[in-house]
Every structure is written in C-alpha cells, then in structure tokens.
C-alpha cells in the first residue's frame, strides 16, 4: 500500500483520519470538520473544511474528491464542482464544495461523512500536432453515435 503525507489541521481529526470502510473500498471517507451544524437550503452551496491537508508529492498521482452515493441519492447533496481534483503538488486544506440540489433543507453535522477521497494514477502527456488523424472505427462520431442499446 502506498502512503501519502497528511497534515492534521484540526485536532478533532486526530481520531477521525480518512479510512476505507471495507477491504474493497476505493474511496476514503472525508468528514465535515465543522464547529456547529450548518443548514444548506435547496440550491445553496457551502465550502466545507475537512480539517486535513495532503501532499501526494509524486506527479504520477492525483486525488479526486467524489460524492458519497447515499448523500446524493437520499438527500440531494452533491459536489458543487462535481469532482474535486487535487494536484500532486497541492498542500492546502482539502475542502468540499457542497451543493444541495434537492428540494428540502439539509443539515450537515460536525464530523459527518460528506465525501470520499480517491487516489488515482496520472499520466502527463505532451502533444504531437498533426494535420489529420489515422482513420479509426469511430471517427468523429460523438454523443450517441454508437447506438441506443
């Protein structure tokens, strides 16, 4: 298992480090490091601190902050930026852009699991400018071009 550096910015996080819920989990749960509950009205967004900073250091990796499926499905709580991309050289606090796309108010409590952190490999590329591409089976077919079923 690869390890990454983590800085605890809020002492409450000492006992609440992100962890995999099961042996097969891809994401580490992130918690809302709040001093008091916040109520998020329909259509509102809040930037919620996690109390943690990470430093991946290796440009071959990035982190993604993703929604927890139950939060979106049951409560309409998703990420305001849809996916949070954390570059390998970022060292600031992890923040979760939280958007209530539902129809009712949602109360987020201190230390509630809010999102998940997934570490992914990254390949940095250069560009080879061409006039034309070699022909492929798909060509320029875009949205819906491979059929409905």
UniProtKB/Swiss-Prot annotation:
GO molecular function, a single term: dUTP diphosphatase activity
- The lineage's top-level taxon is Bacteria
Keyword set for this entry? Hydrolase, Magnesium, Metal-binding, Nucleotide metabolism
Family annotation (InterPro entries): dUTPase (IPR008181), dUTPase-like (IPR029054), dUTPase-like_sf (IPR036157), dUTPase_trimeric (IPR033704)
Known EC number(s)? 3.6.1.23
**UniProt: substrate binding residues:** 68-70, 81, 85-87, 95
Protein's recorded name? Deoxyuridine 5'-triphosphate nucleotidohydrolase
Q: Which organism is it from?
A: Janthinobacterium sp. (strain Marseille) (Minibacterium massiliensis)
